[in-house]
Amino acid sequence: MKNRLILLDGNSLFNRAYFALPPLMNKDGFYTNAIYGFAMMLNNILENYEPTHMAIAFDLKAPTFRHKSYEDYKATRKGMSDELRMQVEPLKKMVDAYGITRVEFEGYEADDIIGTLSKLAENDGFEVMIVTGDKDALQLASQSTAVYITKKGITELERYTDAEVIEKYELTPLEFIDLKALMGDKSDNIKGVAGIGEKTGIKLIKEFKSVEGIYEHIDEIKGSLRTKLENDRESAFLSKKLATIVRDMPLEADMDELLVKSTDYERLSEMFREFEFTTLLNKLKKEQLGKEQPGKEQPGKDQQEPGREKQSADIERADIIYEYDRQWLDSVESADIIINMQAEKGEESNCPDIEKLYIKNANNIYVIDAENIDDAKAILENPSNRIIGHGLKNIYKALKKCGIRIANIFFDIEIAEYLIDSNNTNFTLEYLNNKYGLENFESLEEIIGKGKKELKLIFADKERLSAYFINSLYSIEGCYQMMGPEIEKQELSFVFNEIEMKLVRVLSDMEQEGFLVDTALLRRLSLQYEKEIAELESSIYSLAGEPFNINSPKQLGVILFDKLALPVIKKTKTGYSTNIEVLEALQGKHEIIEHIMEYRQITKLKSTYIDGLLGITNDKTGRIHTTFNQTIASTGRLSSSDPNLQNIPVRTERGRALREVFISKEGYLLIDSDYSQIELRILAHLANDEIMLDSFRKYEDIHTRTASEVFNVPLDEVTSELRSAAKAVNFGIVYGISDFGLSNNLGISKNEAKKYIETYLDKYVNIKAFLSDVVTEVERTGYSTTIFGRRRYIPELKAKNMMVRNFGKRLAMNTPIQGTAADIIKIAMIKVYEYLEESGADAKLILQVHDELILEAAQEQAESLKLKIKEIMEGVAELLVDLRVDIKTGKNWLETK
């Protein structure tokens, strides 16, 4: 095999890793995301490109020759954050443990080291591969040297040889230096020539070949472009000097010194344990034992073309069975079954949402067309088979339409990742595959495109598509094998198995059932609001003295502040602010303000809710089928989208009336069950606060009691104003509100708000102690937990910025309360669902909103179901104070309130 040297730009790549991954910390509060991402990159490179020689170049703190030539070189760069700086030395030690040579040289940058080593290696007949996040390295590309630029994430790379640089940029690699000399580089504070960008720069280089060539022919260049070049002649030549990577450093390097050495498994394992890199540690153990990783190529497979990445689609990983023995398939039991589906069959099919179903067990992969979907029934409906996938809610729902109900929804890697890393917002299979160090394969986005150019699956290349779904099974399996132990390690088994995985089927059925809407009423409301909007427009034009675009903040600002001379409350970069806070501050100053506020309220209701709901009501069912999102809120709360039914306005009379359009079908009633003050009850339990516990046990109005305690007045003398203030403080404490936030909510001074909070905490001493203890514990562990064990990692508590740290404190205090409430409502949903299923009751769960569940039940069963549902929901958790559920029935949602 030809010698292959891989050179890595250490600084570029660990910066890339730091910003590509969410903040990660170990139990000691030590940040690890840059180290983790860098390790992922190293694993990917070592596995997929098999170097014989390797070196990682790092910058030193000392100034380089470029700083001596130009003292403002890189002067605009912000200093390295403490969170990143603390990871540099451990990262270098990790590189040493991998057996990879580190190279640093005072007075030069990592780029120069790479440039010099690559030239030496080329002269010795090596094939060279450079990996960096900096396009400056493209000047080093040649027939023997390929430059790999990080594309997105931490493992996806884009390859450039000299031919590929020319093809993409129409410039040779060396001409890239001249382009940077003209354009400059903000990140390095290289000035270039003011006013020349990439397009003009490329045009000049193509014509004159270099900076020197441009100035030799400056007389041929006309107009303002010539003026720009003449004004910045000195800067152009200096910029070229700064942009040129040195390839003849006084670096005495023997290629044998760069040989990839044996990994120090003991040292690396110790580091991974310290950093709590469970997945990398498991992978390292398998490598050490000589075990094959999921998705790794089979022995005997031909080596890939040197310097090219292995293509998983070409790997024969298992027997892929298109014509299979159904009898054998039916006999599979007590097995881990990995599944994925290719969607988009079409409305007319008996199986409308599935084109193909992909199933993998230990040895084989089965590809089942929609027409033969019944062949999968036995294996999926056998409760002894553990079904594992990514996004199982949608797969379960699609299969249910085909007459198949998965019996054992065992492990969803998307949900597992949501629990393992509560701050992660990316749960795509591609991201998880990269994060857990599995073999890269062509992504779905690469096959079908995205945005306006995105293809429907049925028009995509069939072979590439099939390869993607087959590879996805290995990816899901690999993630599952690594996530399972991590779930146990973080003590998340109850939350994962008993709450989140059981909830998948519940949410899927709720989405499929949908909520019936009165479309006739929606249309009447649309016409009514249209008329009211027209009347308001007329009134506003009359008061303004002229017609204008009311929806234009700029035009509205001119009317209010220039023409009507109202006091300016706030300005933005583009002019006057006319947001709701400004309008509220102007109330009473002019009659037009109330009209504008009402106009905005009605137009929002009409466009977003009235017309919006009409547009997404299913023509066949007459129902709205929202999507419940299980992996969005870090607290564990569910959210809904398309449409967001949790955001139906309730503060205004018109908003509340909107609930009237949500109805039950003929012969049925809606049952609305709502936990009463659940978060305050949880707070009373967690803090073991006698005043609050006593109030709940006596069935007192908790806000009146709080007002009595905080404002030192008898219960019977608490006014509505005092009760409102106490309510704001109660819920402010739950949500970790600041004195600034409370002052805004109550319209009082910041000092008054601060005094309210201090008085509250002086009275409720156990709550004060609880909140303080929670913050201390989170500072120690890095995460906050619910009663049931759900974790939320709070790296903000380690931040340098005081505002960010204070925000972290509020998150730490709020998470046990709000997160526990989220767990309780989810458990309640599961228990109610299971009761309805086991009892055969003619009722279905159709909506969850915050602490509220809505069912649609047969009219004759509604009263008995009310009692049973109340009993179930109030018995979900044993707290020091009873949970209480308010429950009502009605023909529409408004009637249940």
Question: Which functions belong to the PLM regions below?
Answer:
Residues 2, 51-55, 100, 123, ...:
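Non-catalytic nucleic-acid-binding/docking modules located in mid-to-C-terminal regions
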Residues 155-156, 162-180, 315-316, 350-488, ...:
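Active-site-proximal helix-loop-helix substrate-binding element of RNase H-like nuclease domains
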